[in-house]
Curated annotation (Swiss-Prot):
The lineage of its organism: Bacteria, Pseudomonadati, Spirochaetota, Spirochaetia, Spirochaetales. The keyword rRNA-binding applies. One of the primary rRNA binding proteins. Required for association of the 30S and 50S subunits to form the 70S ribosome, for tRNA binding and peptide bond formation. It has been suggested to have peptidyltransferase activity; this is somewhat controversial. Makes several contacts with the 16S rRNA in the 70S ribosome. Keywords: Ribonucleoprotein, Ribosomal protein, RNA-binding, rRNA-binding. This is Large ribosomal subunit protein uL2. The keyword Ribosomal protein applies. One of its GO terms (cellular component) is large ribosomal subunit. SMART domains: Ribosomal_L2 (SM01383), Ribosomal_L2_C (SM01382). PANTHER family: LARGE RIBOSOMAL SUBUNIT PROTEIN UL2M (PTHR13691:SF5), RIBOSOMAL PROTEIN L2 (PTHR13691). It comes from Borrelia garinii subsp. bavariensis (strain ATCC BAA-2496 / DSM 23469 / PBi). NCBIfam families: rplB_bact (TIGR01171). It comes from the Bacteria.
Amino acid sequence: MGIKTYKPKTSSLRYKTTLSFDDLSKGNDPLKSLTKGKKLKSGRDSSGRISIRRRGGGHKRKYRLIDFNRRDKFSIPARVASIEYDPNRSANIALLVYKDGEKRYIISPKGIKVGDVLESGPNAPIKIGNALPLENIPIGRTIHNIELNVGKGGQLVRSAGGYAMILASDGNYVTVKLSSGEMRLIFKKCIATIGEIGNEDYANVSIGKAGKSRWLGRRPKVRGVAMNPVDHPHGGGEGKTSGGRHPVSPWGQPTKGYKTRKKKRYSDKFIIKRRNK
């Protein structure tokens, strides 16, 4: 999927780029049975207070129900009926029609086309888009949509252009290298999908103007030093100031390199190498 640029007829178009959507199926509305309404929370929690800042507005969306698991469809072939846009994630999605007639959405891997036949299960062919247990995938293969707990569905590597690589297999665990540089042990019975995720040009898109951020539901980010003392530890002062202390969050937590991960987290034993700085 390529990048589309615009002639600078207005100032806002000068730096704006968008995806061309050439790889998507034409004229396909999302399948009604696989969508549901999505109420926009504007960053509020159940009590109505802001729990996530800088959220609000944005275009209406319908949530697409994605099958991250594919376990209950082992050994049932499925045909790719369409590749569609999903406003709720950076990756595109593919509509699968199984041999038994059921339809499901999955994250669209890079390189699949309408009409391809995909399969899941321990005996599925080693082919892009097929989902297998990690123990059945050859070393050196790129994978995505990786389970961390058997039966829970894929949790790792689900965004556009993402992939991980199988480095080794020893005993009950497989060593996987993530795109962040982290090397991690994952139980061999967990399933993953072969190949990279498509829509890799998503990272190269330039928003170009503030209005597009608002369409996406993103509100402005205000600097702490521009606030009042009641709103932020960096706020206040006469004239422009530097904040007067080391950088902290609005709640006083040190930032800019301060580690917040618990020192005795249960998953530490599965991490061989931490991610790159």
